[in-house]
C-alpha cells in the first residue's frame, strides 16, 4: 500500500514501521525520498510515532496499517480499499503488482518462527542471545550491528538482511523474525 501511495498517488511523507517489518519500506523511502522511522513492535509504538512525524502510513509485520488523515490505528478496511484502488488504477493483478514492487526494490523474503523452550532455561537462553556481538558469524552471515530497542535485531554486513529475536513476556517462547 505504501508503494501505491508513493507511486500512483504521488503522496510524500514519513513512513513508520516496526523493527519486525522487512526492509522493503526502507528501500521505498530511499527511492522516493521520504524518511522511514522504525519503532518497537506493536501499534502502541507505531501510532505515537505516526502522530509525532505526521506520517503518511504506518504499519507492522502482522499486516496492520494506519493512514494519514485517519485514526492512527490499524484499519484493514481502508487498507484493502486502497489496495483495490491500486489494482483498478493500474489494471494489474496482485501478482503483477508484487512483481512491479520487486522490480523497484528487489525481491524480498520474510519469515517468522515461534519456538518454545523449557521455562527453566529462560535466563540461559537470553544470555546466549545477548552474548552475540558485532563481528560474530551467524548462519554464515556476519553481524554488523545490533539494535536492542525491542529484542535483539541483528543486522548483517553487506546488506545481507537481518534477524530479530524477541522473547515473549509471559511464555517460554522466542519469536524469530528474518
Model-derived segments and their meaning:
Residues 1-2, 25:
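Extended, hydrophobic alpha-helical segments in both membrane/secreted and soluble proteins
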Amino acid at each position: 500500500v505504501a508503494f501505491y501511495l508513493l507511486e500512483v498517488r504521488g503522496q510524500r511523507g514519513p513512513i513508520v514501521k516496526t523493527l519486525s517489518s522487512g526492509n522493503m519500506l526502507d528501500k521505498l523511502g530511499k527511492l522516493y525520498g521520504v524518511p522511514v522511522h522504525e519503532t518497537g513492535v506493536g501499534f502502541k509504538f507505531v501510532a505515537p510515532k505516526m502522530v509525532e512525524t505526521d506520517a503518511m502510513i504506518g504499519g507492522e509485520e502482522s499486516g496492520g496499517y494506519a493512514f494519514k488523515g485517519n485514526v492512527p490505528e490499524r484499519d484493514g478496511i481502508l487498507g484493502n480499499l486502497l489496495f483495490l484502488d491500486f489494482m483498478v488504477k493500474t489494471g494489474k493483478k496482485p501478482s503483477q503488482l508484487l512483481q512491479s514492487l520487486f522490480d523497484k526494490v528487489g525481491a524480498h523474503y520474510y519469515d517468522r518462527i515461534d519456538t518454545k523452550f523449557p521455562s527453566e532455561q529462560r535466563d540461559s537462553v537470553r544470555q546466549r542471545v545477548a552474548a552475540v556481538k558485532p563481528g560474530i558469524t551467524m548462519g554464515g552471515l556476519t553481524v554488523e550491528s545490533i539494535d536492542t530497542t525491542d529484542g535483539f535485531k541483528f543486522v548483517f554486513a553487506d546488506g545481507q538482511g537481518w534477524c530479530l529475536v524477541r522473547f515473549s513476556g509471559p511464555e517460554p517462547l522466542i519469536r524469530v523474525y528474518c
